[in-house]
Amino acid sequence: MKEQFNPAQLSKVIDQALVYQCACPAQVCRAIFELRELYEYQINCASDSVNDELVHKTIAAATEKAHEEMEECLKKILDIDGWDQSTFAMPEGLKKKPGKPL
């Protein structure tokens, strides 16, 4: 599965969200991690029959599409909020923004 963001980048966004209470980008990052886990599970799951194999391939394909969509969503929200995507540093304006608990 193609990955636009590596685990360290996603974790950095999540870590900053915990400190500064900017939960929305972190929620998207968590969803991306969960989709990656689901995809890996489906790819590695043992199949006892042709039907089982088809089920796992169907889930993996849908997960791959959802993952691509969520990575594009993350890119867009980081652009909108003004995150530095070379360092994944949260913009100063968001650090002062009161947020909702994660």
Model-identified regions with their sequence ranges:
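Low-complexity, charged, repeat-rich alpha-helical/coil interaction segments
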Residues: 2, 30, 34, 40-41, ...
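Amphipathic alpha-helical binding modules
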Residues: 60-102
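Secondary-structure edge/capping motif, primarily at the C-terminal ends of alpha-helices
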Residues: 17, 42-50, 77, 81
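Non-transmembrane, amphipathic alpha-helical segments
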Residues: 16-30, 48-65, 69
